[in-house]
Each structure stands twice: as C-alpha cells, then as structure tokens.
C-alpha cells in the first residue's frame, strides 16, 4: 500500500482496493447533497440514493480502519425548506450505529473567530427565510457537527509520539470549537485546515496513517504534512487533485524552510 498519495476515482471503488485494518484515522467532510457543482460528482441525489452512497463509503472506511481506529466525520446541520437538501443527522447516526461504529464525541464547530463575536460568523448559508416575518423564518446554520467515531477499542493499542502543544490540547478538549469557515473560488466547499489539524493532533500519533476519502483540494493532506502524519487521499475531480498536489508541495517546502531556519 502506497502512503502519502492521492488516488483519483470514486471513493467507494477505490476504498475496496485498500487492505483491511490499514488506517489509523479517517478525517473527512463528504458532499452534503445540497446541489453544489463539484465538476464530476452528483450532489443532488434522491434521499434513498444519498443514504445508500453514505452507507457504502462509511462501511468501507470501517473495514479499512484498524481495530482502535477513529473517524472524524464533519457533516452539516440540516436546516432547509427543501427535503432533499442534505442528510438529517439523526438518520446519519442511525446509519453509523448500524454499520458498527460507536459514537465517541459530538463536537460542535461554530463558524466564528471567537465565542463572544457572533458578527464574525463566516459561512456560505445566507438563507433567512421570510425576512422579519413569522410567515416562514429560517435559522441560519452557524455550526456544523464533527462526529468522532470509534471502530472497536476506545483506547489506542500502542503508545506513540503526541505532537500537540498544551494550548492545542486545551482547545481540542472541548466539545465546541471556534474558527471561521473557509472560502475559495477554486473549490465549492473547502473546510479550513484548522478542522483536520485539530482532529489529527488530538486523535492520532506522529506517523499514523490518515485517510480522507473526499480529499478535495487537499486540506487534510496539508494538515498531515504539517503534523508528521502519513496520508491517503481519494478524489474524483482531477482538477482538485492537481490543486491538492500543489498545496501539498507548498506545505512541504514551507516545512523545509522552517527546519533550515
């Protein structure tokens, strides 16, 4: 199995080529099924098709995880007048349990720079529903979930090298995380590097293997390079793979420059 690699293709098929129990941690944010144009993937499936799609990749990730593996799954909070927009998180949790995962933590990612500044909210959801009227008001989703799952063992079977600072540990050891969302003209739904960085620092050791089946523009791989982890990324869109490769090389060069200094 090749590490530190990006693989092109549908993750449901690519994952089948990986051996059982080869990954220490999965960190990903799957398509939310809200109609975004990713270039090669259908982001407007029927409810049944989206649930089947979700079941397929979650089951394959479960298989490739080690017995003590963790899965950090970033998923949006479904707030929409359109039934097909996204997957209800209750349905998702039921599906997760049926596959065999155990829910370890539910982290709330608040898309703000800090808790005392609600105006710093930075996100893509601009729907208010009926403006200043009781006709059909809609609450804006200022948060998303990060479901932290275990395969079997809650405790790691081996001791490794932790690389987080004391402050990083304190920031991660909370069920509410504050940092802004990412914006990009090149990718429809990027997530900020803070998200995989925190998950990787908190739940893995140096040298562990991290899988992202929806690597997109490479954010999880960048976080792996930054923290000294190995990565496997899967992505359907060849343009995103090229973008990710560029970001990874840039991160490696910056790391090399810091080591020289």
What do the PLM-derived regions correspond to, one by one?
Residues 1, 245-260:
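Short, conserved SAM-binding/catalytic segment
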Residues 1-234, 238-243:
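Core catalytic lobe of class I
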Residues 240, 260-261:
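Charged C-terminal helix
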């Amino acid at each position: 199995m090749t590490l530190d690699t990006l693989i092109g293709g549908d993750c449901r098929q690519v994952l089948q080529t990986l051996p059982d129990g080869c990954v220490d941690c999965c960190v990903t944010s799957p398509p939310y099924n809200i109609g975004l144009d990713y270039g090669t993937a259908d982001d407007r499936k029927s409810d049944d098709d989206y649930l089947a799609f979700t079941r397929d990749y979650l089951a394959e990730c479960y298989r490739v995880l080690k017995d003590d593996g963790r899965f950090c799954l970033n998923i949006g909070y479904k707030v929409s007048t359109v039934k097909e927009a996204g997957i209800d998180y209750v349905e998702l949790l039921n599906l997760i349990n049926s596959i065999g995962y155990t829910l370890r933590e539910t982290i709330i990612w608040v898309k703000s720079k800090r808790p005392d500044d609600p105006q710093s909210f930075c996100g893509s959801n601009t729907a208010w529903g009926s403006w200043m009227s009781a006709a059909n008001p809609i609450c804006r989703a200022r948060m998303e979930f990060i479901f932290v799952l275990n395969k079997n063992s809650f405790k790691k079977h081996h001791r490794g090298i932790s690389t987080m600072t004391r402050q990083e540990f304190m920031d991660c050891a909370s069920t509410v995380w504050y940092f802004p969302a990412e914006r990009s003209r090149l990718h429809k739904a990027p997530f900020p590097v803070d998200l995989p960085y925190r998950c990787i620092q908190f739940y893995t050791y140096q040298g562990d293997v991290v899988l992202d089946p929806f690597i997109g523009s490479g954010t999880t791989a960048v976080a792996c390079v930054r923290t000294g982890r190995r990565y496997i990324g899967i992505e359907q869109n060849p343009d995103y793979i090229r973008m990710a490769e560029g970001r990874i090389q840039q991160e490696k060069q910056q790391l090399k420059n810091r080591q020289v200094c």
